């Protein structure tokens, strides 16, 4: 039974990673990842590029950047994300930064609170492909009608070995979340990923 549960979950992580849903939504939500003195890491920049593409395609009129700060940081992941998007031409009044949360669950709960305060309900979540199912599940549990449009570039999707590691990580993290309703981002492979 356990093998079926793990295998089935891994298959769903892989399957949802391939879904790129660009239906119109109230907001595009970019989940945070590491930033260095306000400069997005390669992982975060790949997510931001995807969010800008969705904004430019008219998927939503607003982008929410999420993510807090690590000890010693001057910038939140959300600030670094907003600054990058504005430099790339997204109007500042169309980017909402939510600088709370140091893991996926905390970030999505804070983002959901902000989104719902504005009377919005639907969100396209932008993250890495393997993170999509867990992020969508957490966003739904936080009260959003959410779907995903993952990145398909950046360091997390480069090699089969990297992909396999992240599918295994996300399978474990999703099973842990479903069992406990607690975050599982400490199942770490790479410090750039939030």
Each model region followed by its residue ranges:
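Extracytoplasmic/luminal low-complexity segments enriched in Pro/Gly and acidic/polar residues
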Residues: 193-194
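A transmembrane-helix-recognition feature enriched in membrane-embedded lipid enzymes
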Residues: 160-187
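A structural signal for short, hydrophobic/glycine-enriched beta-strand patches
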Residues: 10-168
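Perimembrane helix-loop junctions in membrane proteins
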Residues: 13-20, 180-188
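Hydrophobic membrane-insertion alpha-helices, especially the h-region
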Residues: 1-9
């Amino acid at each position: 039974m356990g093998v079926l549960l793990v295998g089935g979950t891994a298959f769903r992580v892989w399957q949802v990673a391939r879904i790129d849903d660009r239906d119109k939504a109230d907001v595009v939500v970019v989940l945070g990842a590491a930033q260095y003195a306000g400069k997005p890491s390669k992982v975060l920049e790949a997510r931001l590029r995807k969010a800008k593409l969705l904004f430019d395609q008219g998927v939503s009129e607003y982008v929410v950047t999420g993510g807090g700060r690590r000890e010693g940081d001057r910038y939140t992941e959300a600030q670094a994300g907003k600054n990058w998007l504005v430099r790339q031409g997204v109007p500042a009044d169309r980017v909402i930064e939510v600088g709370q949360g140091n893991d996926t669950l905390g970030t999505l709960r804070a983002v959901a609170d902000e989104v719902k305060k504005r009377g919005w309900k639907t969100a396209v979540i932008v993250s890495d492909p393997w993170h999509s199912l867990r992020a969508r599940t957490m966003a739904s549990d936080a009260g959003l009608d959410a779907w995903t449009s993952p990145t398909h570039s950046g360091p997390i999707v480069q090699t089969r070995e990297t992909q396999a590691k992240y599918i295994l990580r996300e399978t474990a993290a999703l099973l842990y979340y479903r069992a406990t309703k607690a975050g599982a981002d400490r199942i770490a492979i790479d410090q750039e990923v939030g």
